[in-house]
Amino acid sequence: MPALACLRRLCRHVSPQAVLFLLFIFCLFSVFISAYYLYGWKRGLEPSADAPEPDCGDPPPVAPSRLLPLKPVQAATPSRTDPLVLVFVESLYSQLGQEVVAILESSRFKYRTEIAPGKGDMPTLTDKGRGRFALIIYENILKYVNLDAWNRELLDKYCVAYGVGIIGFFKANENSLLSAQLKGFPLFLHSNLGLKDCSINPKSPLLYVTRPSEVEKGVLPGEDWTVFQSNHSTYEPVLLAKTRSSESIPHLGADAGLHAALHATVVQDLGLHDGIQRVLFGNNLNFWLHKLVFVDAVAFLTGKRLSLPLDRYILVDIDDIFVGKEGTRMKVEDVKALFDTQNELRAHIPNFTFNLGYSGKFFHTGTNAEDAGDDLLLSYVKEFWWFPHMWSHMQPHLFHNQSVLAEQMALNKKFAVEHGIPTDMGYAVAPHHSGVYPVHVQLYEAWKQVWSIRVTSTEEYPHLKPARYRRGFIHNGIMVLPRQTCGLFTHTIFYNEYPGGSSELDKIINGGELFLTVLLNPISIFMTHLSNYGNDRLGLYTFKHLVRFLHSWTNLRLQTLPPVQLAQKYFQIFSEEKDPLWQDPCEDKRHKDIWSKEKTCDRFPKLLIIGPQKTGTTALYLFLGMHPDLSSNYPSSETFEEIQFFNGHNYHKGIDWYMEFFPIPSNTTSDFYFEKSANYFDSEVAPRRAAALLPKAKVLTILINPADRAYSWYQHQRAHDDPVALKYTFHEVITAGSDASSKLRALQNRCLVPGWYATHIERWLSAYHANQILVLDGKLLRTEPAKVMDMVQKFLGVTNTIDYHKTLAFDPKKGFWCQLLEGGKTKCLGKSKGRKYPEMDLDSRAFLKDYYRDHNIELSKLLYKMGQTLPTWLREDLQNTR
């Protein structure tokens, strides 16, 4: 109690005036604190008239500081997040947002774009305790800074808990404050600056691909740059630059020497302030070094989950050797330069070798000086790699006879043997990439017959542009690799006459499109031409400068491999690309130009009946075939009326094989082909494949009660003597546990899984628009087929409609409707259709009713969303569920 007594004595000696004075001081302090936080919370950028001057000399600014408490940074936990990037954009068409997406797509990183919410809902960030995103990118960092309190806290807590970083861009405009503090951060921004001479901070921890040994001399693009300044140890500069002149930045001070200081244009937040790591850019991605650092930022903030290895494989093809007009070909000095440059490039790319593609027919068809160049080139035959073009440089798709095509190849091979050119490289390129994609079957067969070709390349798969979408595939035992352009074409032979000026070529090389191609692709096959190596030798100029630039600015390890080994490496990296995706050749003009004129897209079906099995698809197939304007496919010797192209191994036989199942169209416009394959419905690959080849097709599916469908499939298997179906009862099949045999589980899946109607229709809706899909009531098709066929005709939009009431008749013996022929006779389906089965046992029906309850509810929601009528069986089932 002595302390209490002392306090009482002290209070007796303190005057009331002193107490009031202390209370006044306390209130002032409280008001000051409250105003600071309230005022700071409501602004994205705070004016900073007396911001501390940046000390931006060498070493770079951002001196360590411990003024603010440090928070531990949560380490990235790859197993807890999906490798998906969430990109917040200003709009779906904003330039910076598209550039960010383009880099992610080029790197084959998965992403999701969202319009940046101001006060809207934040996308769901977690799913069952797992983070949905490994990285957050804001096109406009102020959209993040100014998030409403709820969403900001939600996002920040997610980033801390799951170790997720943020990349943000600040793009100044005419309304931007010249000097401001970023709300809630110990970071100052100085905007609308012109900068020059950019350098890289060698101490930056995020550097991976970027090599910090160079300075990019000269003016940086634009005058709207923002630089960052802070005294907090959480901020580390990544890129630094000088201002163009001290006069242009009065808000940074009037020191005459200030313009020579370095200012951070990209800054890394190490997470010491609030536990979240960030990388902030003071401009967009127009500056090439920003693209390079952006790639490193993505890698660093995701713990290299979203990054490519440093190895880059490069192959330079020189097409049209011996081909070319006089004046465009290589002479003796050009050939020597080619050989010397190859040796020079080997200093940076071990065993680098130019790959020469020849057409022997044109040997010695230039001037005397050019013919001497041909001779010298052949004397160096062992110094280069070689691959065949066509003998006469003809486009293979123009040859419809495989034997004639093979004869042309044999002439080129004879020329090669006579001149000591190796013929076992296993690689070939078709002139203009003709016949590679779209596939010309005769080319692939002739290549294998004459040359034993294993690898080719094309720039046309799946399309020429955008180049970042080019992919590889394997067809008929031949690996097809994506081929890249490098800014050089047959007509670009003089440096000073380069389109747009020589500076355009240098821009492509030094940080431009060619540089980015190597940066973002593990394997690059470049297409050049003979004419690029004569005259000004732009081919040599381009690749010497490219390799030099890559060596100066990156840590990439440049390598090369012969074509076959390169293809094997490619499909080791991108194994998911082995399966091709056949597209409609008539949807791309370039594809149509290199597709045989004997083929027509009118031969493709306009309607697919996709199933599922045991719902009445064969009956619908028969009814459609009765229409005079509708023609079905020819039957298959293996799968009868079904082609089964899009869901299985037949797909790899190609579109020529597929088209053979349909008649050559007549001159009438009413031709309407269709095909029915009931196992397309629940196939995971069929929707995407079908939509690629038949993007405008209509799709029909028939649904019956999934319990009845499952039982019908079981009985179908028993009728075909399936030993598993004969051994087990239906109830045993559908209730089998996870410990059941693989064969029993397989039968169970074929009974149950196709009945997940909503799941499968959703997959088709991801490939086709809802107005291209019609869901038919299988029960109604069985009882009132004419009514259903009226709906189908309207859906298809056929010119001539027929009255199915007059063409269908019920056959009491069969128990279903059949085609009515002259004289009152009927044509019905075969004996395998309309079988009589025992009634399903009550326990099985009860089990399936419960099993499919949620699936049927989802189906009803989906059909409502599609604007389609609920089948009668579904309405009854839902009513009983209630």
Curated annotation (Swiss-Prot):
The keyword Transmembrane helix applies. Glycans are attached at residues 231, 351, 401, 667. Residues 40-598 are annotated as: Heparan sulfate N-deacetylase 1. Pfam families: HSNSD-CE, HSNSD_N, Sulfotransfer_1. Residues 40-882 are lumenal. The active site is at residue 614. Residues 599-882 are annotated as: Heparan sulfate N-sulfotransferase 1. Its EC number is 3.5.1.-, 2.8.2.8. One of its GO terms (molecular function) is heparan sulfate N-deacetylase activity. Disulfide bonds join 818-828. Keywords: Disease variant, Disulfide bond, Glycoprotein, Golgi apparatus, Hydrolase, Inflammatory response, Intellectual disability, Membrane, Multifunctional enzyme, Signal-anchor, Transferase, Transmembrane, Transmembrane helix. GO terms for biological process: aorta development; cardiac septum development; cell population proliferation; coronary vasculature development; embryonic neurocranium morphogenesis; embryonic viscerocranium morphogenesis; fibroblast growth factor receptor signaling pathway; forebrain development. It comes from the Eukaryota. The chain crosses the membrane at residues 18-39. Residues 1-169 are annotated as: Sufficient for localization to Golgi membrane. GO terms for cellular component: Golgi apparatus; Golgi membrane; trans-Golgi network membrane. Residues 1-17 are cytoplasmic. Adenosine 3',5'-bisphosphate binds at residues 614-618, 712, 817, 833-837. Widely expressed. Expression is most abundant in heart, liver and pancreas. InterPro entries: Heparan_SO4_deacetylase_dom, HSNSD_N, NST/OST, P-loop_NTPase, Sulfotransferase_dom. It is linked to Intellectual developmental disorder, autosomal recessive 46: A disorder characterized by significantly below average general intellectual functioning associated with impairments in adaptive behavior and manifested during the developmental period. MRT46 manifestations include delayed psychomotor development apparent from infancy or early childhood, delayed or absent expressive speech, hypotonia, and therapy-responsive seizures in some patients. Behavioral abnormalities are variable and include aggression, self-injurious behavior, and sleep disturbances. The presence of 4 different heparan sulfate N-deacetylase/N-sulfotransferase enzymes in mammals, as well as differences in their enzyme activity suggest that some initiate heparan sulfate modification/sulfation reactions, whereas other later on fill in or extend already modified heparan sulfate sequences. Monomer. Belongs to the sulfotransferase 1 family. NDST subfamily. This is Bifunctional heparan sulfate N-deacetylase/N-sulfotransferase 1. It comes from Homo sapiens.
